Amino acid sequence: MTKEEKYMHDAGAWECEQRSPHHIYSVGEHTKAVVKYCIDHGAGVELIKAAWLHDAGKMKTKKFDGKYDHFKNHPEVSAQIAEELGESEYVIRLVRFHDAALGRSDVTVQELASYGRKWCDDLAILLMGDLAGQHPTYQIGEKLQQRGIFLQALYRTLEELESIS
Protein backbone atom coordinates (compact mmCIF):
# COMPACT_ATOMS: atom_id res chain seq x y z
CA MET A 1 0.00 0.00 0.00
CA THR A 2 1.41 3.39 -0.97
CA LYS A 3 1.59 6.24 1.55
CA GLU A 4 -1.11 8.03 -0.43
CA GLU A 5 -3.50 5.08 -0.27
CA LYS A 6 -2.66 4.59 3.43
CA TYR A 7 -3.45 8.25 4.11
CA MET A 8 -6.88 7.87 2.52
CA HIS A 9 -7.60 4.72 4.54
CA ASP A 10 -6.41 6.30 7.80
CA ALA A 11 -8.37 9.51 7.11
CA GLY A 12 -11.63 7.56 6.83
CA ALA A 13 -12.24 7.97 3.11
CA TRP A 14 -14.18 4.70 2.85
CA GLU A 15 -16.54 5.85 5.62
CA CYS A 16 -16.96 9.37 4.20
CA GLU A 17 -20.24 9.32 2.27
CA GLN A 18 -20.96 11.91 -0.42
CA ARG A 19 -24.67 12.66 -0.33
CA SER A 20 -25.24 14.53 -3.58
CA PRO A 21 -26.85 14.06 -6.98
CA HIS A 22 -23.49 13.39 -8.62
CA HIS A 23 -21.99 10.85 -6.24
CA ILE A 24 -23.16 7.37 -5.28
CA TYR A 25 -19.84 6.25 -3.78
CA SER A 26 -17.96 7.09 -0.62
CA VAL A 27 -14.85 9.25 -1.06
CA GLY A 28 -12.74 6.10 -0.83
CA GLU A 29 -14.73 4.12 -3.40
CA HIS A 30 -14.75 7.12 -5.73
CA THR A 31 -11.00 7.57 -5.30
CA LYS A 32 -10.32 3.92 -6.05
CA ALA A 33 -12.36 4.24 -9.28
CA VAL A 34 -10.36 7.35 -10.26
CA VAL A 35 -7.05 5.56 -9.60
CA LYS A 36 -8.20 2.60 -11.72
CA TYR A 37 -9.24 4.91 -14.56
CA CYS A 38 -5.87 6.66 -14.47
CA ILE A 39 -3.94 3.36 -14.46
CA ASP A 40 -6.09 2.06 -17.33
CA HIS A 41 -5.17 5.20 -19.29
CA GLY A 42 -1.40 4.89 -18.86
CA ALA A 43 -0.79 6.88 -15.69
CA GLY A 44 2.72 7.21 -14.36
CA VAL A 45 3.63 7.27 -10.67
CA GLU A 46 2.96 10.99 -10.18
CA LEU A 47 -0.52 10.86 -11.68
CA ILE A 48 -1.39 7.82 -9.57
CA LYS A 49 -0.30 9.71 -6.44
CA ALA A 50 -2.44 12.68 -7.48
CA ALA A 51 -5.40 10.38 -8.16
CA TRP A 52 -5.14 8.93 -4.66
CA LEU A 53 -4.97 12.39 -3.06
CA HIS A 54 -7.24 14.54 -5.26
CA ASP A 55 -10.11 14.34 -2.74
CA ALA A 56 -8.04 13.91 0.44
CA GLY A 57 -9.40 17.21 1.75
CA LYS A 58 -13.02 16.10 1.60
CA MET A 59 -12.93 14.48 5.03
CA LYS A 60 -11.82 17.82 6.53
CA THR A 61 -14.18 20.08 4.58
CA LYS A 62 -17.41 18.07 4.59
CA LYS A 63 -20.52 20.03 5.59
CA PHE A 64 -24.10 18.75 5.46
CA ASP A 65 -26.87 21.26 4.68
CA GLY A 66 -29.71 18.95 5.70
CA LYS A 67 -30.04 17.52 2.20
CA TYR A 68 -26.59 17.30 0.57
CA ASP A 69 -22.94 17.12 1.54
CA HIS A 70 -20.70 19.98 0.41
CA PHE A 71 -16.90 19.98 0.28
CA LYS A 72 -16.06 23.66 -0.20
CA ASN A 73 -12.40 24.34 -0.95
CA HIS A 74 -11.50 20.64 -0.84
CA PRO A 75 -8.98 20.88 -3.72
CA GLU A 76 -6.87 23.41 -1.80
CA VAL A 77 -7.07 21.37 1.42
CA SER A 78 -6.20 18.25 -0.60
CA ALA A 79 -3.17 20.07 -2.06
CA GLN A 80 -2.06 21.06 1.46
CA ILE A 81 -2.29 17.41 2.51
CA ALA A 82 -0.23 16.38 -0.54
CA GLU A 83 2.38 18.95 0.44
CA GLU A 84 2.43 17.69 4.05
CA LEU A 85 2.99 14.17 2.71
CA GLY A 86 6.06 15.43 0.83
CA GLU A 87 4.67 15.12 -2.69
CA SER A 88 6.33 16.87 -5.62
CA GLU A 89 5.09 20.23 -6.88
CA TYR A 90 3.88 18.38 -9.99
CA VAL A 91 1.56 16.18 -7.89
CA ILE A 92 0.46 19.05 -5.64
CA ARG A 93 -0.51 21.10 -8.72
CA LEU A 94 -2.55 18.22 -10.19
CA VAL A 95 -4.38 17.83 -6.87
CA ARG A 96 -4.96 21.58 -6.51
CA PHE A 97 -6.40 21.99 -10.02
CA HIS A 98 -8.24 18.68 -10.47
CA ASP A 99 -11.52 20.61 -10.64
CA ALA A 100 -10.25 23.41 -12.90
CA ALA A 101 -12.88 22.55 -15.51
CA LEU A 102 -15.59 23.69 -13.11
CA GLY A 103 -15.08 27.40 -13.75
CA ARG A 104 -12.58 28.31 -11.04
CA SER A 105 -11.66 31.99 -10.98
CA ASP A 106 -8.27 31.57 -9.26
CA VAL A 107 -6.46 29.99 -12.23
CA THR A 108 -6.38 30.62 -15.96
CA VAL A 109 -6.07 28.18 -18.83
CA GLN A 110 -2.85 30.02 -19.73
CA GLU A 111 -1.35 29.26 -16.32
CA LEU A 112 -2.31 25.59 -16.54
CA ALA A 113 -0.95 25.29 -20.10
CA SER A 114 2.35 26.81 -18.93
CA TYR A 115 3.00 23.65 -16.89
CA GLY A 116 3.65 21.76 -20.12
CA ARG A 117 2.17 19.02 -22.26
CA LYS A 118 2.88 16.07 -19.95
CA TRP A 119 1.25 17.85 -17.01
CA CYS A 120 -1.75 18.86 -19.14
CA ASP A 121 -2.09 15.28 -20.39
CA ASP A 122 -2.06 14.05 -16.79
CA LEU A 123 -4.61 16.69 -15.76
CA ALA A 124 -6.88 15.61 -18.63
CA ILE A 125 -6.72 11.97 -17.50
CA LEU A 126 -7.39 13.00 -13.89
CA LEU A 127 -10.35 15.19 -14.90
CA MET A 128 -11.93 12.38 -16.89
CA GLY A 129 -11.14 9.82 -14.19
CA ASP A 130 -12.79 12.05 -11.61
CA LEU A 131 -15.90 12.19 -13.78
CA ALA A 132 -15.83 8.42 -14.40
CA GLY A 133 -15.85 7.84 -10.64
CA GLN A 134 -19.10 9.74 -10.14
CA HIS A 135 -22.74 8.75 -10.52
CA PRO A 136 -23.19 7.09 -13.96
CA THR A 137 -25.97 9.45 -15.03
CA TYR A 138 -23.79 12.41 -14.03
CA GLN A 139 -21.04 11.35 -16.44
CA ILE A 140 -23.05 12.42 -19.45
CA GLY A 141 -24.49 15.70 -20.50
CA GLU A 142 -23.48 19.00 -18.99
CA LYS A 143 -20.46 17.83 -16.96
CA LEU A 144 -18.93 15.94 -19.87
CA GLN A 145 -19.57 18.86 -22.20
CA GLN A 146 -18.10 21.30 -19.67
CA ARG A 147 -14.90 19.26 -19.36
CA GLY A 148 -14.67 18.87 -23.13
CA ILE A 149 -14.87 22.63 -23.64
CA PHE A 150 -12.27 23.19 -20.91
CA LEU A 151 -9.87 20.62 -22.39
CA GLN A 152 -10.25 22.10 -25.89
CA ALA A 153 -9.32 25.53 -24.51
CA LEU A 154 -6.42 24.07 -22.52
CA TYR A 155 -4.92 22.26 -25.51
CA ARG A 156 -5.50 25.20 -27.86
CA THR A 157 -3.58 27.42 -25.42
CA LEU A 158 -0.87 24.77 -24.98
CA GLU A 159 -0.38 24.58 -28.76
CA GLU A 160 -0.12 28.38 -28.93
CA LEU A 161 2.53 28.37 -26.20
CA GLU A 162 4.45 25.54 -27.87
CA SER A 163 4.44 27.37 -31.23
CA ILE A 164 6.01 30.42 -29.58
CA SER A 165 8.86 28.51 -27.96
Residue ranges and their predicted role:
Residues W14, P21-H23, H30, T61, ...:
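Residue-level detector of solvent-exposed, low-hydrophobicity positions
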Residues I24, Q110-L112, K143:
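Short, polar loop/linker segments at the starts of domains and inter-domain junctions
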Residues W119-D121, L126-L127, L131-S165:
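Charged substrate- and nucleic-acid-binding regions of tRNA-handling and nucleotidyl-transfer enzymes
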Residues M1-F64:
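Acidic/His-rich, divalent-metal-binding segments that scaffold phosphate/diphosphate chemistry
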Residues K3-K6, D10, E46, Y90-L94, ...:
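Exposed alpha-helical structural elements
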